[in-house]
A protein has these predicted regions:
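Active-site nucleophile/metal-coordination loop of metallo-enzymes that catalyze phosphate/sulfate
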Residues: 1-158, 163-167
């Protein structure tokens, strides 16, 4: 109490738009907080950058996207997506994946397989089904005779794929 009363202080917000996330409903994490504090200013980070690139069309106009689509179509191969599967909006958002799938279909990709990393950190630990079930319904609507899309594999994000807990890197 004495420190707060007798010395200058400033409260910092470490979530939402204060640290460059899309909305104030996004809880943030230490990474985005450190980036904002270290930079001394707020700048778009992670999922917000991806959202912006989808909204302004830069993602789909990029050489990488164009080459990926061209390669899959020319070789009659499968397009694969691997990534964090949640709406935590720190590292990713399911809407990013949906936008890429819709665009892949529009551009004539015929076969897509999705490899999901269940979150449990930026969202609730046991929340996987609340994301998988509606996403399966979305895939069913998107699927057609000319577009075969489905979840091919899945797993968790902890230890091996994203987080370093008890890992000796």
């Amino acid at each position: 109490d004495r420190l707060m009363r007798d010395y200058p202080m400033l409260r910092l917000r470490a979530h939402g738009t204060a640290v460059g996330l899309p909305s104030d409903d996004d809880m943030g994490n230490s990474e985005v907080g450190h980036n904002a504090l270290g930079a001394g200013q707020v700048f778009s980070q992670g999922a917000k950058l991806v959202s912006e690139s989808i909204e302004n069309g830069k993602m789909f106009a990029s050489d990488t996207w164009k080459a990926l689509v061209a390669n899959v179509k020319e070789n009659h191969s499968t397009m694969h997506f691997l990534g964090l599967f949640s709406d935590g909006n720190v590292h990713s958002h399911i809407d990013h994946l949906k936008a890429m799938l819709i665009r892949a279909k529009q551009e004539g990709v015929c076969r897509v397989r999705i490899h999901i990393l269940l979150d449990g950190r930026d969202v609730g630990e046991t929340s996987a089904l609340q994301y998988v079930e509606p996403f399966e319904a979305f895939l069913s609507e998107l699927r057609g005779s000319d577009f075969d899309v489905r979840i091919a594999s899945g797993g968790g994000r902890m230890t091996v794929t994203m987080d370093r807990y008890e890992a000796n890197w």
